[in-house]
Amino acid sequence: MDGTLFPGDDDLAIPATEFFSTKAAKKPEAKREAIVKADGDNNEETLKQRLTNLEKKITNVTTKFEQIEKCCKRNDDVLFRLENHAETLRAAMISLAKKIDVQTGRRPYE
């Protein structure tokens, strides 16, 4: 069963290599040097752009996380109020049923 991802009880095992590779592809050295030379001129500028893009993405994720947190808290408060309301309705229905039983004579007054 080694090298498989989540095989079912009666399914055939699926090799893990079909989903991902654990080895990085090697790039030819000649092309690598040409790419490094081309990137070397604007290396600092591209690095700054990458950092600003990364900062924007992180800021976006944190703001979305804060919004999700606020929504979850609000939903928790609403759920608490609904549960409390349901319990109040249940108690009111029980007391009403007792009152009706007493008034119709099915149950003696307590």
From Swiss-Prot:
Keywords: Coiled coil, Disulfide bond, Phosphoprotein, Virion. The keyword Amino-acid biosynthesis does not apply. It comes from the Viruses. It is found in: Virion. GO terms for cellular component: viral envelope. GO terms for biological process: fusion of virus membrane with host plasma membrane. The keyword Cell cycle does not apply. Transmembrane segments: none annotated. Homohexamers, covalently linked. Interacts with OPG144 and OPG153. Structural protein involved in the envelopment of mature virion (MV) to form the wrapped virion (WV). The wrapping consists of the addition of Golgi membranes to the mature virion. Participates in mature virion (MV) movement within the infected cell. May play an indirect role in MV-cell fusion. Belongs to the orthopoxvirus OPG154 protein family. This is Protein OPG154. It comes from Variola virus (isolate Human/India/Ind3/1967) (VARV). The gene is OPG154.
